[in-house]
């Protein structure tokens, strides 16, 4: 276990599926950097600073996990972090084609950077940040899909605090 890995994503917000993969990656690698992307093509509900703070709170129990916001190319961020592995999650076959293209592009840009794919636990296989936000936006209970810190942050952000 000598390898430094990066688990990149938008994490808007972090879900139980993300946490499942982070916990498993933390067992596989010496150090895991959660790279929270400031992706200008997406319009996140939470600011980069809010996402970094939420992910820090949710992963505080993992000693070998660090949370860092970044912008720019992922391969450049990986070099800065001295990481040799990208951890990516595959929820369904529909994720595979995009992830396959992304892995090949990253390999072209940085031949020493390997992509490793983890599948979520069955109970998390359908959870996505987009679905969680949609349920929360319509007043649904998302507590079974996200950490209590995230439930509270979503309620505050969406002004759906219930009495």
Curated annotation (Swiss-Prot):
InterPro entries: Cyt_trans-like (IPR004821), PPAT (IPR001980), Rossmann-like_a/b/a_fold (IPR014729)
Annotated keywords: ATP-binding, Coenzyme A biosynthesis, Cytoplasm, Magnesium, Nucleotide-binding, Nucleotidyltransferase, Transferase
Residues binding ATP: 10-11, 18, 89-91, 99, 124-130
Cellular compartments annotated: Cytoplasm
Pathway: Cofactor biosynthesis; coenzyme A biosynthesis; CoA from (R)-pantothenate: step 4/5
Cofactors (names): Mg(2+)
Binding-site positions, substrate: 10, 42, 74, 88
EC numbers for this chain: 2.7.7.3
Pfam families noted in UniProt: CTP_transf_like (PF01467)
HAMAP family: PPAT_bact
Entries under PANTHER family matching the protein: PHOSPHOPANTETHEINE ADENYLYLTRANSFERASE
Family of the protein in this entry: Belongs to the bacterial CoaD family.
NCBIfam families: coaD_prev_kdtB, cyt_tran_rel
Protein name, entry field: Phosphopantetheine adenylyltransferase
